[in-house]
Amino acid sequence: MASILRSPQALQLTLALIKPDAVAHPLILEAVHQQILSNKFLIVRMRELLWRKEDCQRFYREHEGRFFYQRLVEFMASGPIRAYILAHKDAIQLWRTLMGPTRVFRARHVAPDSIRGSFGLTDTRNTTHGSDSVVSASREIAAFFPDFSEQRWYEEEEPQLRCGPVCYSPEGGVHYVAGTGGLGPA
């Protein structure tokens, strides 16, 4: 539970999903979790869930009609997933770089140490998902964390997490401001 002093630069939020192929393998799930921590992301919220097919269809609506749509929807509803809200000064781009290319074959060749390069099986079973823009991040976070208020987080929690000493709670799986005891959000 080491305390880390954060930088004064503003934090950005992104959604990170760990897909059923990785959640089904505890060692892979833990390896991905450790990569999140070792890359200095703050875990703002985390939850595991079973995604209903209807929710998958709504989430991936922009891909409806494409050849992979049905396969992706079925796969994402096939088992538990883990959803994170991650914060970092450049969270979206850093998470996308850490994930590696969507296509596993490409990931293995151009980013072999990326999450997808290391653990991806196919272009659908590629271990992770991440938001591709600030607008997508807001929409996707709201889909997985409907009770999370991004505006309130930026007003109340972000300044504390950005400037204060921050600790990680292995029990809760999230970061918190030192001195708060790690009970709930910052």
UniProtKB/Swiss-Prot annotation:
Which body tissues produce this protein? Answer: Expressed at a moderately low level in many tissues. Most abundant in kidney, prostate, ovary, intestine, and spleen.
Q: What positions does the entry give for ATP binding?
A: K19, F68, R96, T102, R116, N126
Q: Which domain of life is it from?
A: Eukaryota
Q: Which cofactor does it need?
A: Mg(2+)
A GO cellular component annotated for this chain's UniProt record is: mitochondrial inner membrane
Q: Which InterPro entries match?
A: NDK-like_dom, NDK-like_dom_sf, NDPk6, Nucleoside_diP_kinase, Nucleoside_diP_kinase_AS
* GO MF assignments: ATP binding; metal ion binding; nucleoside diphosphate kinase activity
**Which reactions is this enzyme annotated as catalysing?**
a 2'-deoxyribonucleoside 5'-diphosphate + ATP = a 2'-deoxyribonucleoside 5'-triphosphate + ADP; a ribonucleoside 5'-diphosphate + ATP = a ribonucleoside 5'-triphosphate + ADP
Top-level EC class as recorded in UniProt? transferase
**CDD domains according to UniProt:** NDPk6
Q: Where is the active site?
A: H129 (pros-phosphohistidine intermediate)
Q: What are the UniProt keywords, alphabetically?
A: Apoptosis, ATP-binding, Kinase, Magnesium, Metal-binding, Nucleotide metabolism, Nucleotide-binding, Transferase
Tell me which Gene Ontology terms the entry assigns under biological process: apoptotic process; CTP biosynthetic process; GTP biosynthetic process; negative regulation of cell growth; negative regulation of mitotic nuclear division; UTP biosynthetic process
The EC number(s) given in the record are 2.7.4.6
Q: What does this protein do?
A: Major role in the synthesis of nucleoside triphosphates other than ATP. The ATP gamma phosphate is transferred to the NDP beta phosphate via a ping-pong mechanism, using a phosphorylated active-site intermediate. Inhibitor of p53-induced apoptosis.
Q: Which PANTHER family match?
A: NUCLEOSIDE DIPHOSPHATE KINASE 6
Family statement: Belongs to the NDK family.
Q: What is this protein called?
A: Nucleoside diphosphate kinase 6
Organism this protein belongs to: Homo sapiens (Human)
Q: Which gene encodes it?
A: NME6
